[in-house]
């Protein structure tokens, strides 16, 4: 955060010294607990030329987000969205459905976001959402390093065909069901979904492959 603020200061200073420099810039951003960030930081982003950010929200569940080691809450994220709206910064949200620790109530909290935050879609603060396909477990990823703790097994070593003994209800078929339900809820509230058909075709391919192996 310190380095980002310093970068913004340099760019703001350059713009002030060069009135014709109307450049914009974009990047990835991380939501944080709102008590660690003030409004001045968001204003500084906008004044330096930021007009679009990609942010990993991941889920509507604070519990699941914490298990990913992402320590911001949904309320924290909403504060950032309000600030983005105020300072005309657009964003695209990245999501993961069916994370290893996700229970049905967590999934419902994700679905609730689409109606709750439809106002940010209407204001074009949120310009799109990336829903992904289905979660793949890679060996060297943080969750991949917890395979034994989460009692994970795989169908034919396929990274997307996993099962967790700690969350047995979340089999592949349930993950696909939740992913499709999330997709439908996003459409219901007019959220633009990026790479929509590509992701759905990937899910279809993965599901058919697992069915053949079973």
Which residue stretches match the model-derived regions?
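Detector for methionine-enriched segments
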Residues: 1-3, 68, 83, 95, ...
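Conserved SAM/AdoMet-binding glycine-rich loop
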Residues: 1-92, 99
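Generic preference for well-ordered secondary structure
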Residues: 29, 52, 94, 187, ...
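Noncatalytic linker/hinge segments flanking ATPase motor cores
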Residues: 32-37, 65-75, 92-100, 133-142, ...
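C-terminal accessory regions of radical SAM enzymes
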Residues: 105-214
